[in-house]
Amino acid sequence: MEFDISGAKIFARIPTGIPVLGDILITETLVVSWIVMLIITGLCIFLTRNLKVEKISKRQAVAEMIVEAATNLVRNNTGGTKFDNLIPFVSTIFATSIVSNLISLIPIFRSPTADLSTEASWAILVFIMITANKIKAGGLLGYMKGFTEPIPVMTPFNILSELATPVSMACRHFGNILSGIVINGLIYAALAIASGALLGLLPGAVGDFLSHIPILSVGLPAILSVYFDWFTGAMQAFIFTMLTIMYIANAAEG
């Protein structure tokens, strides 16, 4: 039995004719990311249809609970309503992250977060918002001066520290999700091989038939999937969201 853990598949290449840019790749990560966006958009449309002030539906009640949870998450970690403008951005990051992590529960889909480019794009957006808030709080000159503190010789280290923020956010999330996929894949493949070897010891046609059925692969991979996909996926989405809130809030405070 073969089990591919080599990475996202490339479905198509679109030549750009520009040597620097190379070809535009339509990858498995890109396609599944579109599916994730469609799922989130569909849920938003479904939950926000026919909104009412009184006698609200169960669907609207769920929508209000989600909005209230997102609002409380931001306000409880920033000390008030000052950063309410972050709520839509933070909610989008969390929703995209958790759906991307959990979509791998469907066997035909590979989680987009198992591709570093996904987390890197999120981290770049967060980094831009952090930098914009720092400049807004202290001005451009104040932002540049901050790299020379407490003494000018620390400037290279301060620059590295600034760049390390998006890198660490992206790599932390990516590493946890990818490791789960790799471990699941290795265990599934190992159990399939063990199943074929053990059942192949049975005499006659029965052993020959059962050796081609990965019986041992049923059960344990599913249990591991509950941990790596559900628990770790939800936890990493929460951690990335919390770091986003704290970094941007701290930047705005100067």
Where are these regions (language model features)?
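Selective transmembrane helix interface/packing segments
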Residues: 1-254
